[in-house]
Regions:
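Ser/Thr-rich low-complexity repeats and stalk/linker segments
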Residues: 2-112, 154-157
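Residue-level detector of conserved, well-ordered beta-strand and adjacent loop positions
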Residues: 10-13, 122, 132, 146, ...
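Short, well-ordered turn and helix-capping elements at secondary-structure junctions
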Residues: 13-16, 149-150, 170
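Soluble periplasmic/extracytoplasmic beta-strand elements of cell-envelope proteins
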Residues: 38, 81-83, 120-122, 144, ...
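Residue-level signal for well-ordered, solvent-exposed loop/turn and beta-edge residues enriched
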Residues: 45, 162-163
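Primarily a LysM-type cell-wall glycan-binding module
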Residues: 110-137, 159-162, 169-170
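Short solvent-exposed coil/turn linkers within tandem alpha-helical repeat scaffolds
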Residues: 136, 151-153
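Short, structured beta-strand/loop micro-motifs enriched in basic residues and often containing a Trp
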Residues: 142-149
Length: 170
């Protein structure tokens, strides 16, 4: 019998915005149903670490869900890497590090994230103008809008029709 294991992340997805507390969900299997979860900064240092229990138990793939809490978050707009993996049942020097079926998801952290607005760029808009228009809904900056929208490669060039995420902070 050729039973294999797997881990898949359903949330968050690549380039999602996350706050200092966010939910990780997916499907997977690991030793005794344990799914390992780590959040790394750009240097690879661990910002948060936790685990979840797969509903599949020992060998079956099942759903999992848990909350990640970052006690010392990086500055707003920082790209971080979420690692999700099946727990390694071996000794520290055995098996893959950090675990089996490693999945990595690059997300953008805004520690005080309250949510975000979806804004459709109109003819004549600038990022500074968008900051002014959205001010009644919450605080944001041009730099944060650029960080929240990977498609913006030059802050002076946005296109009519683009949908932008406008991060709102507490």
């Amino acid at each position: 019998m050729a039973i294999i294991t797997d881990v898949r992340v359903r949330q968050p997805l690549k380039d999602d915005l996350v706050g200092r507390r966010f939910t990780v969900t997916g499907i997977g299997s690991g030793f005794e149903g344990t799914i390992g979860i780590r959040l790394l900064d750009r240097r690879g240092d661990v910002l948060a670490q936790t685990s979840a229990q797969s509903a599949g138990g020992m060998a079956a793939v099942g759903e999992f869900s848990t909350e990640v809490r970052v006690t010392s978050p990086p500055p707003a707009g920082t790209r971080v890497t979420l690692q999700v993996f099946g727990d390694n049942p071996g000794l520290p020097d055995e098996g893959p590090d950090p675990g089996f079926n490693l999945r990595e998801v690059s997300v953008i952290m805004f520690p005080d994230l309250q949510g975000w607005l979806l804004y459709r760029v109109e003819r004549g808009d600038t990022l500074t103008g968008i900051v002014r228009k959205t001010r009644p809904f919450g605080r944001t900056t041009v730099k944060q809008i650029v960080a929240a929208n990977p498609r913006i490669t030059d802050p002076d060039r946005i296109e009519t029709g683009w949908r932008l995420r406008i991060p709102l902070r507490d």
